[in-house]
Amino acid sequence: MTASNRPLCVDLDGTLLRSDILYESLLALLSNNPLYIFLVPFWLLRGKAYVKRQLASRVQLPAETLPYDERVLEILRTTTQRPRVLCTASDRLLVQPIADHLGLFEEVMASDGQTNLSGSNKGQALAARFGERGFDYMGNGQVDLKVWAHAGGAIVVNNGAGLVRAASRQTEVLAHLPA
């Protein structure tokens, strides 16, 4: 499978968005009712996926006002010959409306309240779905090295040359969009 027909899997937080949905949703929740600050530590006892689901079930983020990275949107708009997958550790309840708003993804993979789809969990899920080296992955952070270990190619976004070098030890770096 060549890079031209491998699915392009795109991270949300820090990659497609110049922000993080977890922080956006926490701020929205606390601005609506500051008393939730006392519940969040108890939610954390049940894990990150649980926290994300609790936030997602209580807030709505307007997809049209989120801070998208226009360079990533342009790649997605011009990459129509292969499947595009939004793959994120953010909760599906918040992510699906974003994907629907953009209309650029054929599939969404996201945290679900039980599994935090981050790092090695994300890498394993993508490899199970598309096969080892059967997808390209666009990400922005150290945690994405665990995904690039399974990917056919890497697109590094909003980070420096150090992450590009580290990614190149995992897979072929197809592009670098620095911060």
Predicted features by range, described:
Residues M1-A56:
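Active-site neighborhood of HAD-like aspartate-dependent phosphohydrolases
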Residues M1-P7, E64-A179:
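C-terminal cap/substrate-recognition subdomain and adjoining C-terminal extension
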